[in-house]
Amino acid sequence: MGVDIKELVEPVAKEVELGFFSKKVIAIDAYNSLYQFLATIRQKDGTPLLDAQGNVTSHLNGLFYRTINYIELGIKPVYVFDGRPPELKQKELERRYQIKVEAEKKYREAIERGDLEEARIYAQQTSRLTAAMVHDAKLLLRYMGVPYVEAPSEGEAQAAYMVKKGDAWASGSQDFDSLLFGSPRLVRNLAITGKRKLPRKDVYVEVKPEIVELEELLRVHGITHQQLVVIGILVGTDYAPEGARGIGVKKALKLVKELKDPEKIFRSVEWSSDVPPEKILELFLHPEVTDSYELTWKEPDKEKVIELLVERHQFSMERVTNALDRLEKAVKTHFKQQSLESWFGF
């Protein structure tokens, strides 16, 4: 779900072309991207891509081709995977499960009615990412020579930490939580850049990447990072989705400016969760992160990629080999005056 502070972010978000990120390291929220691929890469009736054994492969399809697109533009992606979810998130995970169950029911009903448009919308809400699917995604990245990081807990917190350290230029995620975790820079729409159809409408829109600078966001609204986190908590986060009763973004912004002190603010509102807001504040300000990672980009192992995608999951041999040729060509084209070592080493 993520925190909904779009109202605050919109005035400072800047659209750019994907090529703007050439030569930049982007710490991408892996789960966020994989779920987007699972939601968008589907057949007309909403069915995801499947291999001969019935295993879902939409996530691998998106990860493979989108990552090659990044590298063709000179972008240096590093994918950050979630670790153990915080205990505070348990109720939200249960809520998401129930949403998927209800969506599956509505999907089946839409299929029975022959309403493929409605079926596809509900199908997108049923996406599940299993341990086996995550394992295959990591294998694919390893074989492609693209680094990934295993966060101890929240992937967005780890990505934000890497940007703060200077190991990455920006966090890449659709969710605004990255800003609450303190990422100096957030890039949205990376995984969905291009033409996208609007739900229930025969209308296509061009989706472009957008950049949000944390410092500018805070300056424009006259708040501190801690106050931004408090606003997010009041509006609702993954740890307490309901937030404070009757509090929207505008009212939350007014409260943090008037009362300033988080304890006073939390005492002044009707809290709708049994999770103490102080604990959520602590989690955002001091998340669990690690320095145990290495950002090294290597040459792809074409045979291993073919073994995983073509032999195990029945991808088209022609499409995969053509894509791998593009990957090799992209490295030579963009960095022909550098040795592979000088580019692939951060």
From Swiss-Prot:
Signal peptide limits: none
GO molecular-function terms, A-Z: 5'-3' exonuclease activity; 5'-flap endonuclease activity; DNA binding; magnesium ion binding
GO biological process: DNA repair; DNA replication, removal of RNA primer
Binding site for Mg(2+) 1: 29, 82, 154, 156
Region annotated I-domain, chain positions: 118-260
Entry's cofactor comment: Binds 2 magnesium ions per subunit. They probably participate in the reaction catalyzed by the enzyme. May bind an additional third magnesium ion after substrate binding.
Keywords: DNA damage, DNA repair, DNA replication, Endonuclease, Exonuclease, Hydrolase, Magnesium, Metal-binding, Nuclease
Record field: transmembrane: none
Pfam families in UniProt: XPG_I, XPG_N
Source superkingdom: Archaea
Cofactor: Mg(2+)
Chain positions covered by the region annotation N-domain: 1-100
Residues that bind Mg(2+) 2: 175, 177, 238
EC number, UniProt record: 3.1.-.-
SMART domains: HhH2, XPGI, XPGN
Presence of the UniProt keyword Cell membrane in the record: no
Region (Interaction with PCNA): 336-344
PANTHER family linked to this entry: FLAP ENDONUCLEASE 1 (PTHR11081:SF9), FLAP ENDONUCLEASE FAMILY MEMBER (PTHR11081)
Record family assignment: Belongs to the XPG/RAD2 endonuclease family. FEN1 subfamily.
Biological role stated in the UniProt entry: Structure-specific nuclease with 5'-flap endonuclease and 5'-3' exonuclease activities involved in DNA replication and repair. During DNA replication, cleaves the 5'-overhanging flap structure that is generated by displacement synthesis when DNA polymerase encounters the 5'-end of a downstream Okazaki fragment. Binds the unpaired 3'-DNA end and kinks the DNA to facilitate 5' cleavage specificity. Cleaves one nucleotide into the double-stranded DNA from the junction in flap DNA, leaving a nick for ligation. Also involved in the base excision repair (BER) pathway.
Summary of subunit composition and partner proteins: Interacts with PCNA. PCNA stimulates the nuclease activity without altering cleavage specificity.
Protein name: Flap endonuclease 1
Taxonomic source organism: Thermofilum pendens (strain DSM 2475 / Hrk 5)
Lineage: Archaea, Thermoproteota, Thermoprotei, Thermofilales, Thermofilaceae
